[in-house]
A protein has these predicted regions:
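Helix-turn-helix
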Residues: 24, 32-66, 70
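N-terminal intrinsically disordered/low-complexity leader segments
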Residues: 1-20, 90
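Amphipathic alpha-helical packing segments from all-alpha helical-bundle domains
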Residues: 77-80, 126-152, 156-167, 184-196
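Short secondary-structure transition hinges
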Residues: 106-142, 153, 174-177
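Alpha-helical DNA-contacting segments of helix-turn-helix folds
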Residues: 68-75, 132
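Hydrophobic alpha-helical connector segments
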Residues: 70, 84-110, 161-165, 187
């Protein structure tokens, strides 16, 4: 279901040097976003920090939104790798999905500036970034499916449920960043959604 990072998000680098360059760009982006949020990520500074020409940066990522959405994909991929290191705790799919989404939420809340930059980019994305945004949403849905199915192939119903829950998860992050709900309320809402959608 998910689009592998580096394919739909941008053209897959073909050489070791290109892969290293792309990694430096993403790391520079994450550092700037963590320091000052969305506004702190300026393409020229990203190019300088990652030691690439500005034109090269734009060939990889046509805009700041493309860049930050790709950085979001990178963070979700890191999360997926961490979750695969051991069995996800929980005797039911509700418990396992709750664990995954709680970990995901807490991971974002530890760095509000970075979260603001990544989620704001998702909100600002227009039709030119549609494939990238879809890829990120699919990654989040796949994390949920991973918890639901424990390695088994998902059903169409599983994919529909995961889509609903990732929509709720993203919506609650947006509300939190906008100051409309507290961090505690985020989790209350997500837990309620899990209970309603996944009735074991």
């Amino acid at each position: 279901m998910a689009t592998p990072v580096g394919t739909a998000l941008t053209a897959e680098p073909e050489s070791t040097a290109q892969r290293a360059r792309r990694a430096r760009i993403i790391q520079a982006t994450l550092a700037l976003a963590s320091r000052g949020g969305y506004e702190a990520v300026q393409m020229r500074e990203v190019a300088e920090r990652s030691e690439v020409a500005l034109g090269t940066l734009y060939r990889y990522f046509p805009s700041k939104v493309h860049l930050l959405v790709s950085a979001m994909a990178h963070e979700l991929e890191r999360m997926r790798v961490r979750l695969q290191r051991k069995a996800i705790p929980g005797d039911t799919r509700q418990e396992r999905v709750s664990y995954v989404l709680e970990r995901s939420t807490h991971s974002l809340q530890r760095d509000p500036n970075l979260t603001e930059a990544l989620v704001r980019a998702m909100m600002a994305a227009d039709a030119t970034v549609a494939d990238e945004v879809t890829g990120v949403r699919n990654q989040m849905a796949d994390l949920i499916i991973q918890a639901m199915r424990e390695g088994e192939a998902p059903t169409e119903e599983d994919e529909a449920y995961a889509g609903i829950l990732q929509d709720v998860w993203f919506a609650r992050q947006i509300a939190w960043l906008g100051g409309r709900i507290s961090s505690e309320a985020i989790w209350d809402d997500i837990e309620q959604a899990i209970a309603l959608v996944l009735r074991d």
